[in-house]
């Protein structure tokens, strides 16, 4: 069984994957004072039987590293994955300082297009792979190098984000884009080896400024796009695609087993259910409302 969780964090991003193998992956961190203990307790509980834990940080925007110091102080992060960068900020918060400390430490593994690592995407006799692969960045690409320089100069680090996939035999395929911007994605759309996916977590929390170009979506052919928690007036609702909007769904949990992904949301009154989800009797998850299941080929 695999569980993918997208936390409702009030305009930020934070996810985890509880793998079917001996792995636990966190993607980004957005923890506020009011939710810090509940998130910490959930992470500890869900990861307690996993030997390998990693945190993948897409980029050091505040809404992707908020609460990182708290998390690091209270939860073991032995493996910190990020794009190699020298991002700077005029306002050096405690969380940004912690990001830089982890980024520049011996805990860091710098991710790039096609990289491999035990047990991110390699198996051995000890444990299986996580199924995490990095589709971007190409470290020699001119647009990416310009984005690195912008981040080093203290400008927006949005376009240093990696493109991450989760895909493993007999499980669902999902994409994360961090906060990549539309213009940047248009520039690299022919530089990425796109694969079809069941789920896409929309770039930049679903904002129009990060709308994934149609040419990319046509290659990915997502069955469901999850739109994040940007202000509603800034969202692109991806007309023509089935979507779940986190502003109203709140926490989203996807439980994958036996070629079926069961979708649960924490808002019991969520009504806008994707048409391609089918209801299967007997699906339950404590504290959540079941909204339907998606069949996939694995």
What function would you assign to each model-found segment?
Residues 63, 89-94, 102-109, 175, ...:
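Internal alpha/beta domain cores that form substrate/cofactor-binding pockets in large enzymes
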Residues 28-30, 58-60, 83-85, 113-115, ...:
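Active-site-proximal beta-strand/loop segments in catalytic clefts of secreted hydrolases
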Residues 1-50, 113-196, 253-298:
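Core dinuclear metal-dependent hydrolase active-site scaffold
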Residues 2, 50, 75-78, 107, ...:
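A structural micro-motif
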Residues 5-7, 25, 56, 81, ...:
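Hydrophobic/aromatic beta-strand patches that form the interior of the parallel beta-sheet core
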Residues 91-129:
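Conserved glycine-bearing catalytic or ligand-binding loops at nucleotide- and phosphate-handling centers
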Residues 25, 33-87, 191-207, 218-225:
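Active-site metal-binding motif and surrounding structural segment of the metallo-beta-lactamase
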């Amino acid at each position: 069984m695999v569980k993918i969780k997208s936390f409702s964090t009030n305009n930020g991003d934070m996810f985890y994957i509880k793998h079917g193998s001996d792995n636990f992956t966190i993607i980004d961190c957005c923890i506020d004072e009011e939710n810090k203990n509940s998130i910490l307790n959930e992470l500890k509980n869900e990861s307690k039987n996993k030997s390998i834990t990693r945190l993948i940080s897409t980029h050091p925007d505040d809404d992707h590293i908020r609460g990182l110091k708290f998390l690091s102080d209270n939860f073991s992060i032995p493996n910190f994955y990020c794009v190699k960068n020298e991002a700077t900020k005029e306002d050096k918060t405690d969380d940004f300082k912690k990001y830089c400390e982890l980024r520049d430490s011996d805990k860091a593994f710098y991710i790039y297009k096609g990289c491999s690592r035990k047990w991110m995407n390699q198996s051995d006799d000890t444990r299986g792979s996580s199924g995490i692969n990095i589709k971007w960045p190409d470290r020699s690409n001119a647009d990416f190098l310009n984005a690195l320089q912008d981040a080093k100069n203290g400008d927006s680090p949005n376009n240093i984000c990696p493109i991450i996939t989760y895909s493993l035999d007999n499980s669902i395929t999902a994409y994360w884009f961090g906060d990549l911007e539309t213009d940047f994605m248009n520039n690299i759309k022919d530089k990425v080896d796109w694969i079809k996916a069941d789920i896409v977590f929309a770039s930049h929390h679903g904002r129009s400024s990060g709308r994934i170009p149609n040419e990319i979506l046509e290659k990915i052919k997502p069955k469901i796009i999850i739109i994040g928690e940007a202000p509603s007036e800034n969202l692109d609702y991806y007309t023509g695609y089935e979507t779940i909007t986190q502003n109203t769904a709140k926490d989203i949990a996807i439980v994958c087993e036996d070629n079926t992904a069961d979708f649960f949301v924490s808002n019991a009154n969520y009504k806008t259910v994707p048409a391609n989800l089918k209801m299967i009797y007997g699906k339950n998850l404590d504290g959540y409302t079941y909204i339907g299941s998606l069949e996939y080929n694995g």
